[in-house]
């Protein structure tokens, strides 16, 4: 058995969403999907994009990208144990995790809304995130407040 480390090539053929050619939208559809029913998730997203176009008369992909950008957190707190006590240490978040947290928060808050159909809930939540309001933005703000209040422990970041 060889002790040599194997170097694996990253997957270079990245899939893209067929209508808007957007990787983040493809990730959003995949996170929205239940039980492998991708066509249902795609219909939900495209119908909510139609609703967004009716309500705001702005290109829905611009609304979507701005909603994701407004919802992405920059810092998070991680619990680190030093000398028998736990500290909440603020740390920067890698960009792929920022996007995934934003997607997860938007979908989660859309599912908790009270509108009748998921299309309405998703479109309203995307519009709210586009306008810097809504539950997903509240989650981002609370995460940033937590990091700001624990800024005194930022020097523990190296551990």
UniProtKB/Swiss-Prot annotation:
Q: Which InterPro entries match?
A: Ribosomal_uS7, Ribosomal_uS7_bac/org-type, Ribosomal_uS7_CS, Ribosomal_uS7_dom, Ribosomal_uS7_dom_sf
Q: Which UniProt keywords apply?
A: Mitochondrion, Ribonucleoprotein, Ribosomal protein, RNA-binding, rRNA-binding
Species this protein is from: Reclinomonas americana
Q: Where in the cell is it found?
A: Mitochondrion
Q: Which family does it belong to?
A: Belongs to the universal ribosomal protein uS7 family.
NCBIfam families in UniProt:
rpsG_bact
In terms of HAMAP family, this protein maps to: Ribosomal_uS7_B
Supply the name of the protein. Answer: Small ribosomal subunit protein uS7m
Q: Does the keyword rRNA-binding apply?
A: yes
Q: Which SUPFAM superfamilies match?
A: Ribosomal protein S7
